[in-house]
Amino acid sequence: MSDKVIIIGGGLAGSEAAWQAARRGMKVELWEMRPGKLTPAHSTGYLAELVCSNSLRADSLENAAGLLKAEMRQAGSLIMEVAAACRVPAGKALAVDREEFASRVTAILEAHPGITVIREEVQAIPDNGPVIIATGPLTSPAMVRALKEFTGAEYLYFYDAAAPIVTAESLDYSRIFKGSRYGRGEDDYLNCPLNKEEYEAFYQALVTAERHPRHEFEPEVVFEGCMPVEVMAARGPDTLRFGPMRPVGLIDPATGREPYAVVQLRQDNAAGTLYNLVGFQTSLKWGEQERVFRLIPGLREAEFVRFGVMHRNTYVNSPRLLQPTLQVKGYPWLFLAGQLTGVEGYIESAACGLVAGVNATRFARGEEPLIPPPATAHGALLHYITDPTHTPFQPMHINYGLLPPLEHRVKNRVERNRILAARALEIWNSSGEFSGN
């Protein structure tokens, strides 16, 4: 029996885990090495800093990410509460002012009487549990060594890439139109249309641009969900036109037709002064980014306030290491959470932290940790990452394909997802502690 939970890592997962444990009366030590020691991608000491995008993805139940958010809200998620307060326009997606979001999460956790935030790097795993390790995709080398020595497991490496951000005032709006695909949502996106000649010139510049070199000790394994735009382009001349530059559902008012290709810009802060290039995560050198991306209509004079960056992402072989409760096999007092487990995405990481916070509290009190029901978004995601049949193991976003199928076939995808969501929420809302009941 214990009244304390130790959490290593103050990202989305660690922050949510700390909140869940503290609201259940536990004394929480939350260890975060920033700002004294920054990662290659972080730039502040804020807890829950967003580094890849300001979007928390779809908020509608038509998308499984929306279902996961709905379950988290029911469970009293801090990340969902703060995201709602910091929301910026993004159509049917949930996007936030990233600085306001992280600063609010930090202020709330630092002010909580049951939480002590310690700004130091942890280089060894404490042997007095329960302990939650939520050090994220940029786990420090010292902690990687500690984990490897402790678990004996092999680690896999792949790359995440962050998209550039430009100032709104530097854009040429005579070459840009507002709108969302198929008219869904408000006119929350800025669209930069390209004709065939413009696209081909942009494509050639992109695939021949100079990239930042990767570290020799890291094999180049790229996760599809955050692939650098130049890597995607190298697959073929039309790959981008069927990916982030797809024009479907967008009509250029200047021509009355769909463009040959389009680059979308999404608002990045509440003031509307910054926009990020949607789907344009990149590892190009900074000078090359200016040269290549200024070929996009509307961006010829763009001011880049942040260039795209490339960083290593670390995750464990969860099917070998973890139980669905997020406990390490053979070490029931040790929990892992967040992207370190192989979940991919902001919301997935926070959801993972939510479960870890609940279960670490239960373990501390001598209670049996819980497994979220498999027909819920939380349960389906954790089942996937801990299923030993997944070989080789790859990171995964939440999606409806992870949930158990319906007993009867429904051909219409939207209707099928609606039924899956209704079933999941009914089960989640009666699941006891996870549901907030």
From Swiss-Prot:
<keyword id="KW-0285">Flavoprotein</keyword>
<dbReference type="InterPro" id="IPR004417">
    <property type="entry name" value="TrmFO"/>
</dbReference>
<dbReference type="Pfam" id="PF01134">
    <property type="entry name" value="GIDA"/>
</dbReference>
<keyword id="KW-0489">Methyltransferase</keyword>
<keyword id="KW-0808">Transferase</keyword>
<comment type="function">
    <text>Catalyzes the folate-dependent formation of 5-methyl-uridine at position 54 (M-5-U54) in all tRNAs.</text>
</comment>
<dbReference type="GO" id="GO:0030488">
    <property type="term" value="P:tRNA methylation"/>
</dbReference>
<feature type="binding site">
    <location>
        <begin position="9"/>
        <end position="14"/>
    </location>
    <ligand>
        <name>FAD</name>
    </ligand>
</feature>
<dbReference type="GO" id="GO:0050660">
    <property type="term" value="F:flavin adenine dinucleotide binding"/>
</dbReference>
<dbReference type="GO" id="GO:0047151">
    <property type="term" value="F:tRNA (uracil(54)-C5)-methyltransferase activity, 5,10-methylenetetrahydrofolate-dependent"/>
</dbReference>
<keyword id="KW-0520">NAD</keyword>
<keyword id="KW-0819">tRNA processing</keyword>
<dbReference type="GO" id="GO:0002098">
    <property type="term" value="P:tRNA wobble uridine modification"/>
</dbReference>
<keyword id="KW-0274">FAD</keyword>
<dbReference type="InterPro" id="IPR036188">
    <property type="entry name" value="FAD/NAD-bd_sf"/>
</dbReference>
<dbReference type="InterPro" id="IPR002218">
    <property type="entry name" value="MnmG-rel"/>
</dbReference>
<dbReference type="GO" id="GO:0005829">
    <property type="term" value="C:cytosol"/>
</dbReference>
<dbReference type="InterPro" id="IPR040131">
    <property type="entry name" value="MnmG_N"/>
</dbReference>
<keyword id="KW-0963">Cytoplasm</keyword>
<protein>
    <recommendedName>
        <fullName>Methylenetetrahydrofolate--tRNA-(uracil-5-)-methyltransferase TrmFO</fullName>
        <ecNumber>2.1.1.74</ecNumber>
    </recommendedName>
</protein>
<keyword id="KW-0521">NADP</keyword>
<comment type="similarity">
    <text>Belongs to the MnmG family. TrmFO subfamily.</text>
</comment>
